[in-house]
Amino acid sequence: MEYVIRECRLEDAAAIHKLNSEEMGYDYSLNETVGILNRLLFDAQHKIYVAEFSGRVVGYVHIAVYELLYAPKLINIMGIAVSSSFQRMGIGKALLEQAELWAKEIGASGVRVCSGSNRSQAHALYRSMGYGDGRTQLNFKKMFEL
């Protein structure tokens, strides 16, 4: 199977929106996805790569610089998804390798990824690529009415 990993373009928004909805269960409008993608593509602190197969985007990884006052600079994987029809073909691994490449290019000390506790297939991939288990945390969120 031939696929290519390339930098994301604005015209990839619909495919990313579909992956977010179908593979990760996020209900976020296409218009909002286009708006945020348009901003992130020009933000040097963020990078988005897509996996393309026969002209169709079948996966993506969104990474961002992660800097703290108490640890060295890392790259944080903000989102990674591969179409269920294309999973277990090496695409997720290739996307992670691309993220690691960018991390090294910008002088980051490593890559950080948080993953839902039910995503055992993803956990197996991360472990197979040398990612160690971090500490268990709870994720709190407070949304504001706009």
Model-predicted regions and their roles:
Residues 3, 7-11, 17-73, 78, ...:
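Acetyl-CoA-dependent GNAT
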Residues 46, 135-139:
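Short hydrophobic/aromatic beta-strand or adjacent loop that forms the aromatic wall/cage
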Residues 73, 89, 105-109:
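Short coil/turn segments at alpha/beta junctions that flank glycine-rich nucleotide-binding fingerprints
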Residues 80-87:
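A short, internal acetyl-CoA/4′-phosphopantetheine-binding micro-motif in the GNAT/acyltransferase core
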Residues 88-101, 128:
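Conserved acetyl-CoA-binding loop-helix of GNAT-fold acetyltransferases
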Residues 93, 105, 117-136:
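Conserved active-site alpha-helix within GNAT-family acetyltransferase domains
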Residues 96, 103-115:
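Conserved GNAT acetyl-CoA-binding A-motif
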Residues 138-146:
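Terminal substrate-recognition subdomain of acyl/acetyltransferases
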